[in-house]
Amino acid sequence: METINAQIIMNRIEDNDVNWIYHHFSDDFQEVSSFDELTKLLEEYNRIRTTNTQYKHIHINHQDEYIWFDSKMTSGVSVTLNKYQEIISLVLIPLRHIHVSKNTKQTYTLPIVQDWLVWSGGDNVLLNSHYHYKHQRHALDLICVEQGMTYKGNPQLCENYYAYNKPILAPANGIVVEIVDGIADGVPGEINTNHPEGNYIIIKHNRHEYSMIAHIKPNSFKIEKGDELLRGQHIANVGNSGNSSEPHVHFQVMDSNDLQMAQTLKIKLHNYASPVKGDIVTYTGDNILVNKDNYFSAFIKSISTNITQIFRN
């Protein structure tokens, strides 16, 4: 088996080596990919890019993701390999930064305890899958990882995931203004698009800010609508309800409690923490610690089924 590393992959991309890249696609990825589309994509990407620098290497759940940004942060690349070193995802995109971002006025803590991995979070689409959507743009997704895996045993059972049933905490003092419960946890790998948030809670905080935590385990709420909460209070447990491919915590802060109309705010966290995809975050009850040097620097949410092309004039 040919050994592939990050430098080899990037060299082939920068050389427009379509044959080599397509040859290293998995069979499933070739079936949904076009050789001609790949040719055009590489040409367009190399037309706009500057010098690339590797940003992260992901090695988790038997998959590897490599992420690069160019020197001007105007374009980025993500390549994911399976355990056979076949390419199962390829993303080459221009990076569009939203310069007008409102920060929260008050400070929050993360709604978790102990060590969690930031699955999605940051200021571009390669780091944050929510970034295109103003009502989720600054959301964080958090998962648990042990020895390079998010689960043990059968990956189709929620209870085999390390995040499942862990406590969720109130991120700041506030009042519960909405609870949705009764939506069953889904089978990992399958999603519920009819109820994308799954079971969730919205908490009203000071200064007209509202936090929302989603994908909660059904019948695990420890509080009720109208209850006053204290920061760090146990409010529910982690589940896999809604549009969730595996048990995790979705956390965002908004300027309204209307999920369809609200805009997310960039969360000002305790200790000035600013975690992004791949960081390990630890909340001790007093401090938020961020480890940006963790080897398992991101999580592969799912195998991409298409070559992503978002180049526009």
What are these regions (language model features)?
Residues 163, 173-217:
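Zn2+-dependent peptidoglycan hydrolase active-site motif and core
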Residues 19-59:
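Short solvent-exposed beta->alpha transition segments
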Residues 209-232:
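Short histidine-centered loop motifs in beta-beta connectors
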Residues 57-106:
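Exposed beta-sheet edge and beta->alpha loop/turn motif
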Residues 195, 222, 227-230, 252-313:
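Acidic, glycine-rich catalytic/binding loops that coordinate metals and/or anionic ligands
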Residues 3-28:
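Short acidic-aromatic low-complexity motifs
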Residues 174-176, 226-238:
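A structural signal for short beta-strand/turn segments enriched in small hydrophobics and glycine
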